[in-house]
């Protein structure tokens, strides 16, 4: 950085501190990842200067020749990755993408069936504190109490009873494969629209490691970060018949000017996602998650649903004498970043929780593999078994720093 230290030393110091945290801490938050230098460069480019309300070839401002090219490239790439008929890459976030779909198919008060947030869903799938729960009449399906997996017969029975206008599938904390074909059959049976929020698994879907929702859903939304390893942002895929309505819902419906520098960064991430290396990376994410899950089970931890099929796992801490909130704090003090997370049928409030969510995308980006995952699982166990012992946390923190030195993120490129 050449100019920031002089112009704004406070922000410069905060950024440098965050760089250090990312380099020397173990990032296990399932929704986080490390973008490439190319993505960072695109997002920090002069495209941030350009206003471009509208769509390529139909802008409300002049001077859009080059940003049109950028957006066209991004749209074509993401359509190619997922085999979609239409794509909108303008949503600023996954929440905005979901809002746009809701605005297309729903009126205030319409019935929607989505996954319970407490069972692994997402705020925008009908939480009463979110716009989705305030505007629409959401009902919820969850996981089976015994298997802790989605029971599709129960979903079908709920759908038959409620006759929702829209069914939403997708999750933020569900460690198993989701059967989108079954959901589509349920939606068809009750005459509902079907939307999938694949934000967490978009990278796995791109690599063919999770069944794609695109052939089955009327609408698919996603973020571009998480497993897709792009900038923070969103996109929508849909059938051609909904293309005009979706585009109108995004602009002028819920957004004004698109963030062209972010769309450029999305395009770069999409190109990276089309490479053979990306597929291998996604395979390793899953291998790493399975290795860590197996090691945690060996160490005596109960995982929700008994394991994982994807990039994340939920650890039930109820028999360990520690809450999710306490675990998150203790691990952070030892240089390991996770997030407290509700488990299905959690007796604790969402601000405390009985579990933690662990994900492997970011550490896999660093080049870590199964052996490192097993080692990290043991470090997690050491901290959680002694979460009030400052000496243990300090010891683990040093071990974490030594491990991080072997797998640099951006230091090797400086």
Curated annotation (Swiss-Prot):
Catalyzes the reversible interconversion of serine and glycine with tetrahydrofolate (THF) serving as the one-carbon carrier. This reaction serves as the major source of one-carbon groups required for the biosynthesis of purines, thymidylate, methionine, and other important biomolecules. Also exhibits THF-independent aldolase activity toward beta-hydroxyamino acids, producing glycine and aldehydes, via a retro-aldol mechanism. Pathway: One-carbon metabolism; tetrahydrofolate interconversion; Amino-acid biosynthesis; glycine biosynthesis; glycine from L-serine: step 1/1. It is found in: Cytoplasm. GO terms for cellular component: cytoplasm; cytosol. Gene3D superfamilies: Aspartate Aminotransferase, domain 1, Type I PLP-dependent aspartate aminotransferase-like (Major domain). The record marks 225 as: Plays an important role in substrate specificity. This is Serine hydroxymethyltransferase. Its cofactor is pyridoxal 5'-phosphate. GO terms for biological process: glycine biosynthetic process from serine; tetrahydrofolate interconversion; tetrahydrofolate metabolic process. It catalyses: (6R)-5,10-methylene-5,6,7,8-tetrahydrofolate + glycine + H2O = (6S)-5,6,7,8-tetrahydrofolate + L-serine. PROSITE patterns: SHMT (PS00096). It is an enzyme of class 2 (transferase). GO terms for molecular function: glycine hydroxymethyltransferase activity; pyridoxal phosphate binding. (6S)-5,6,7,8-tetrahydrofolate binds at residues 117, 121-123. Keywords: Amino-acid biosynthesis, Cytoplasm, One-carbon metabolism, Pyridoxal phosphate, Transferase. Its EC number is 2.1.2.1. It comes from Dictyoglomus turgidum (strain DSM 6724 / Z-1310). Homodimer. It holds the Pfam family SHMT.
